[in-house]
Amino acid sequence: MNNTIKLIIAIAIPLVIGLSGGAFTAAEIPGWYAKLQKPSWQPLSWLFGPVWTTLYILMGIALYLVWKSDAVQSARQTALILFAIQLTLNFFWSIIFFNQHQIGWAMAEILVLWIFILLTIFSFGKISQTAAWLLVPYISWVSFAAILNYTIWKLNS
């Protein structure tokens, strides 16, 4: 498989997962989510889509750099497994928070997600420093999202 195809696939994977998770989110924004008490510093709702799209593209490029690398198979395999775990956790956070309305459980889940993103960054860094750095905006945004999740949880408990 040539590198162009690998790049397209690598970017498509997080985008498709993200859009799938977004399907659970979109329906709840005007109803349940709009009724929640939220902090004054929460970003405008329209900002989340472009931010997540950008992050999913960066994740895909990072995935591509690891996938195409000549790193030892075991290191690459570990990195790809960690990436898959964090991407799965990313998907399920939307379901837990928006679809199931379980803000507390979503808080617990996002902490586990954060740990797996960090493990993925370290694992990617052993293979490609660029790939690791491409995930820094992602963990930064998830850190912010965790603080927002916690604040919404406390405001609505």
Residue ranges and their predicted role:
Residues 27-40, 68-73:
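Membrane-interface helix termini and inter-helical loops of multi-pass transporters
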Residues 43-58, 102-113:
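Membrane-interface loop-to-helix entry segments
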Residues 57-94:
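Helix-adjacent hinge/juxtasegments
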Residues 73, 93-104, 126-129, 153-157:
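Membrane-interface helix caps and helix-loop-helix hairpins in membrane proteins
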Residues 80-87, 106-120, 138-142:
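Hydrophobic alpha-helical segments of small multi-pass membrane proteins
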